[in-house]
């Protein structure tokens, strides 16, 4: 898809600043309809581009603004910042029980007094204010396609003829479907996409993560920034050496939020202790950029298991099981290799065929839970790789495993990949293994993914 017009969050907010702030009281506090009343000081404002292929107007003309975001790019924090800055409430479809015809109207009157709810909807329709709807993709999962369209019809009935009435956020697939449907209903839609951070914003992101729990002294700050820049420069140099197209991929990789979180963990002040010593160690060992990339991959995968899937899915499934079973499940489920394989099967459009834990009851609940979690995996952008680095890492990691080898070759036979990236990663991951002639033949394609 072609992306045009880069703008920052402040520019987007300024285009909606004439909207009247929400002035009513909710009947009860809830997670499905709320107003953000605080600002996250560690939040770094993203930039956006307009996806021209699925937009039918510019931002100024839009009756609906759709914001597309892949998993782990800070969509939830963006929603909070929009709500806080504009003083406009959020309907979170991830928390609602029902999504369908009139469900939006019903939700509003469930949480507001009748006269106030009616007045607020009238103000939306007259263009005086607007509403934020988050987790459009999760709403789609709770219904069928017709139910989703019925929900969008409910939205359409409340739209101003001349002004923006709704800002809706969600994953790529649901946003694209909503855009096509609303366009078919004659509604003016502008679709935005969250862009990777620029180098300066990447540095700001890392700084805020590293310093959020521990302020650095002036002396430590100088050494910290030198170490931070060394890591970012090492990663950037790896891509620059391979040509302009790969340099652009490198900028996208370095500016991707999950990558920056991994770098922040690597530079965590409580773990590092002495930045000057770390900096000298990195320089002295001439640490290769490929080693840094592998460290980042490990941290991203470890983080997805430790902070997301274990507490939010696995622990709930095993809570009534024996101590020994819990130990096995926590060890064997959602390993780094399994995560890579599950992403590969999603890219192939196939179901994952293996059981990481040999227990039918666990497997049923685990598979069901991952239907929700896997689309948000940081290696994915919809049903495509989030970045060429993730794509090649998955293939290089799995191709030496007989369990997944056929799936890797099926992917290679139908997809163009970055050969140089694949071979660099393969060599580093499989130091004791020679490269098969079949791998060389299969991967000799021109550069593939954007």
Predicted regions mapped to residue ranges:
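Extended hydrophobic
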Residues: 175, 183-186, 197-203, 211-212, ...
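Extended amphipathic alpha-helical scaffold segments
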Residues: 2-13, 129, 352-356, 366-382, ...
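Residue-level signal for threonine
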Residues: 45-48, 52, 387, 415-419
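Aromatic-residue hotspot detector
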Residues: 66, 78, 385, 390, ...
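P-loop NTPase signaling cores
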Residues: 1-292
């Amino acid at each position: 898809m072609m992306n045009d017009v880069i703008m920052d969050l402040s520019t987007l907010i300024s285009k909606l600043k004439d909207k009247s702030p929400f002035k009513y009281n909710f009947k009860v506090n809830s997670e499905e309809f709320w107003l953000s009343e605080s600002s996250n000081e560690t939040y770094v404002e993203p930039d956006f581009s307009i996806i021209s292929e699925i937009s039918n107007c510019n931002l100024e003309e839009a009756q609906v603004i759709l914001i597309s975001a892949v998993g782990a790019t800070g969509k939830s924090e963006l929603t909070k910042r929009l709500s806080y800055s504009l003083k406009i409430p959020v309907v979170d479809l991830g928390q609602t029980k029902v999504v369908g015809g009139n469900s939006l109207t019903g939700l509003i009157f469930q949480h507001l007094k009748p006269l106030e709810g009616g007045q607020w909807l009238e103000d939306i329709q007259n263009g005086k204010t607007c509403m934020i709807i988050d987790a459009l993709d999760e709403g789609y999962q709770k219904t069928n396609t017709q139910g989703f369209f019925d929900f969008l019809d409910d939205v359409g009935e409340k739209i101003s003829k001349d002004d923006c009435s709704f800002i809706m956020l969600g994953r790529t697939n649901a946003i694209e479907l909503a855009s096509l449907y609303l366009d078919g209903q004659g509604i003016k839609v502008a679709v935005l996409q969250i862009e990777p951070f620029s180098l300066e914003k990447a540095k700001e992101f890392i700084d805020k993560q590293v310093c959020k729990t521990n302020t650095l002294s002036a002396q430590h700050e100088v050494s910290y920034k030198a170490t931070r820049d060394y890591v970012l420069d090492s990663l950037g140099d790896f891509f620059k050496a391979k040509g302009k197209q790969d340099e652009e991929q490198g900028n996208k990789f370095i500016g991707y939020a999950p990558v920056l979180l991994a770098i922040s963990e690597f530079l965590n002040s409580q773990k590092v202790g002495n930045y000057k010593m770390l900096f000298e160690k990195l320089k002295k060992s001439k640490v290769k950029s490929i080693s840094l990339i592998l460290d980042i991959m490990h941290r991203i995968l470890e983080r997805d298991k430790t902070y997301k899937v274990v507490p939010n899915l696995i622990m709930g499934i095993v809570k009534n099981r024996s101590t020994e079973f819990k130990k096995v499940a926590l060890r064997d489920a959602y390993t780094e290799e399994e995560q890579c394989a599950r992403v590969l099967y999603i890219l192939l459009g196939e179901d994952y065929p293996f059981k990481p834990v040999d227990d039918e009851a666990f497997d049923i609940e685990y598979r069901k839970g991952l239907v929700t979690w896997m689309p948000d995996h940081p290696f994915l952008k919809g049903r495509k790789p989030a970045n060429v680095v993730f794509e090649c890492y998955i293939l290089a990691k799995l191709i030496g495993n007989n369990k997944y080898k056929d799936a890797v070759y099926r992917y290679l036979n139908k997809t163009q990949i970055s050969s140089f990236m694949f071979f660099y990663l393969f060599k580093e991951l499989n130091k004791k293994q020679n490269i098969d002639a079949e791998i060389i033949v299969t991967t000799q394609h021109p550069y593939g993914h954007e």
